[in-house]
Amino acid sequence: MAIYMSTICFGSIECKLPYSPASCGHVTEEREVLASVEPFMDLEAQLSARLLRQKHATVRVLKNGTCAYRYKTDAQIVRIQKKLERKERDEYHFQMAAPSIVSKITIAGGDPPSKYEPQTPKRVIHTTPRVRKVKKHSIIKLTESQMNHLIKQVKRIMSAKKGSVHLINKKSTHVQYKEILGTTRAAVRTAHMMGLRRRVDFRCDMWTTERLKCLARTDKWSNRVHTINIRKGDSGVILNADSLKGHFGRSSGGLFIVRGSHEGKLYDARSKVTQGVLNSMVQFSNAENFWKGLDDNWARMRYPSDHTCIDGLPVEDCGRVAALMTHSILPCYEITCPTCAQQYANLPASDLFKLLHKHARDGLSRLGSDKDRFVHVNKFLVALEHLTEPVDLNLELFNEIFKSIGEKQQAPFKNLNVLNNFFLKGKENTAHEWQVAQLSLLELARFQKNRTDNIKKGDISFFRNKLSAKANWNLYLSCDNQLDKNANFLWGQREYHAKRFFSNFFEEVDPAKGYSAYEIRKHPNGTRKLSIGNLVVPLDLAEFRQKMKGDYRKQPGVSKRCTSSKDGNYVYPCCCTTLDDGSAIESTFYPPTKKHLVIGNSGDQKYVDLPKGDSEMLYIAKQGYCYINVFLAMLINVSEEDAKDFTKKVRDMCVPKLGTWPTMMDLATTCAQMRIFYPDVHDAELPRILVDHDTQTCHVVDSFGSQTTGYHILKASSVSQLILFANDELESEIKHYRVGGVPNACPELGSTISPFREGGVIMSESAALKLLLKGIFRPKVMRQLLLDEPHLLILSILSPGILMAMYNNGIFELAVRLWINEKQSIAMIASLLSALALRVSAAETLVAQRIIIDAA
């Protein structure tokens, strides 16, 4: 046996091993090699039909939210495939076609049809034109679908408001929506509901039946209703015959109109019953329950009588008088309506008295000739009319008395206030309040009897009101971050918004006219000369000293009109200043300045650089507009964030109210209003105010000083002191003096092109109202209006219709959302207007109810 060597490698090591081949012979055998098979080929062939159906299927959503395939039929799939093949074939032929230019399009290569039409020449027909134009009224015709849509919309509206619908064909059918069986359902008026007992309780034709079926399809129409759940008061209700369960009779048209029951079986009102069934049938009307409750409680609740009662009055007339009394005392549209009862209970006492008075008077007129038979009813209604007769209360007198002595609680003013309140309440006073009023009247009688003399007033010769030599310390002018490197006040954003004052209430000084054209300031009772001419400084010292003397104007001495008092005590900030000897301090020459605002009344005056206008020219207040310097001085104490709103309020709210040459009291009142919105202005320093008793005028000194001298000087130096004039109880002549006002010719204050542009001028009331109406129906305009001019919301109180439209469109809610985090005062205004709209809506409901009751 031969031995061979075999080599085996382990990495880089070779091993040689001997071996001997087998002694058996070689056998040759062919092995069958299986061909490679695609494992998913059979699966794809099996699923090809399913995948083809899913390819053309659409997806639909079931009621439970599950998505499922909606498969096409075999015929639809064949049509879809043929359409796709035809589209691919046409696209292939189009792509492979030779390029060509289309220059003409014809019908089958022929001429257009218009070429073969005979052309008849047009000739003029000479006729007399008709003067009267005939109006052709088109007949409105509705298709079946439009008619069904109209009925559905009417049904939706009436079911929501519990209204009624009348179907008119050959006869009228009244359909009323009521709350029955836990939902709103339609009900018809049957014969037994009107007191008639007939074998057929309700008749209607096929057209009415179809319309009733449409009107009765309200919410829960398909819900199951069992006959045992139907009770008294459900007569005439229209039910779904397919969803009705229990023992009931025949019906038609898919409707079941409830009539009554007999031996446990419910009957349709359209069914014809026998006379025996009619006599023993239990009708489902509320009338039987009403009479049952009346009969059961009449004998139990009646009072004992001292005579033997007889039947002397007709029963029908007694029923009519009972209805008359019910509507006179407890008016309602339906006696079973809880809403009518709640509205009656919610009436204020004054409104209830007015309602009873009117209904008692109507009851007397309705009683008519029967008052001789029903004398007790007539006497009761006469007494009720007299007791509830409204008293004509004059609120103006009450307000006048309250403003005069309302805050005084010492005698005899306390007793007068008690009587004032007593007369205001009128017939609503209780027995205790009558007793208190009589005691107050007794105290007043004793006081008047024992009074012998008035309290002696103090002598004006002892009046002193010295002007402090110390200057007021202004925080805003002393803060480092409000000053520049030269210690001048920085206006910041206030300078930009102050342009609303300069563009509307100031005018540029024209150098061509000269300073002399602006020296005379006119007011209603005279003139005052400014020292603007002294801006041209003479170099001659004697001439300069002569100009500094001014023009002296003699004023009367210190008298009662120089003072202001309250409760017998002087209010010194509202009085003229005096020297130590009691004589008045007279104003001296005030030199002019160039582009400065002069503030401060005590000590040294403060000079603040004026905000820059649109040009580098000098600015002077328009004639009669000097008081605008008060608001310009208040702007110093307003933060930069509120400067825009402040200037707009002054422009749009204060100036229109002040009018031409307002009184000092009106100016103080507007300052008090602005202090509520911007509390920081309470200590704002004012320009010096000069008092001219001869012309009864207060002059606000501006940057151009005053050439006229001799005026008295008002002590008020801050806004909080000026506000003291806004008091009706302040005894002062100065508060009625004129200060300044709107010029006669200022056309740019009438309207504005763009109410949203920065620095836009004031709008008139009509223009602002038109803009507000425009914003109601344009949300973008209203949103911008709320951001720029939110106080225009207050104009909505001019009309209840505007107020309700803004409330229904959610404008007040939008205003609250926009301003609740920015300025709560505006959000509060929007909330108050929203609450007012709710009260207007309730008032309209009460008026509508009263009209319905009067018409009943």
UniProtKB/Swiss-Prot annotation:
Pfam families: Peptidase_C6, Peptidase_S30, Potyvirid-P3
Site (Cleavage): 284-285, 740-741
Active site residues per record: 192 (for p1 proteinase activity), 201 (for p1 proteinase activity), 235 (for p1 proteinase activity), 626 (for helper component proteinase activity), 699 (for helper component proteinase activity)
Keyword Hydrolase found: yes
Segments carrying motif Involved in virions binding and aphid transmission: 592-594
Record-annotated Peptidase S30 domain positions: 141-284
Annotated InterPro entries: HC-pro (IPR001456), HC_PRO_CPD_dom (IPR031159), HC_PRO_CPD_sf (IPR042308), Pept_S30_P1_potyvir (IPR002540), Potyvirid-P3 (IPR039560)
Gene Ontology MF annotations: cysteine-type endopeptidase activity; serine-type peptidase activity
Reaction catalysis annotation: Hydrolyzes a Gly-|-Gly bond at its own C-terminus, commonly in the sequence -Tyr-Xaa-Val-Gly-|-Gly, in the processing of the potyviral polyprotein
One Gene Ontology term from the biological process aspect of the record: proteolysis
Protein name, per record: Genome polyprotein
Protein origin, superkingdom: Viruses
Protein family membership: Belongs to the potyviridae genome polyprotein family.
Source organism per UniProt: Potato virus Y (strain C)
Tagged with keyword Hydrolase: yes
Keywords: Host-virus interaction, Hydrolase, Inhibition of host innate immune response by virus, Protease, Serine protease, Suppressor of RNA silencing, Thiol protease, Viral immunoevasion
Residue ranges annotated for the Peptidase C6 domain, each copy included: 618-740
EC number: 3.4.-.-, 3.4.22.45
Source lineage: Viruses, Riboviria, Orthornavirae, Pisuviricota, Stelpaviricetes
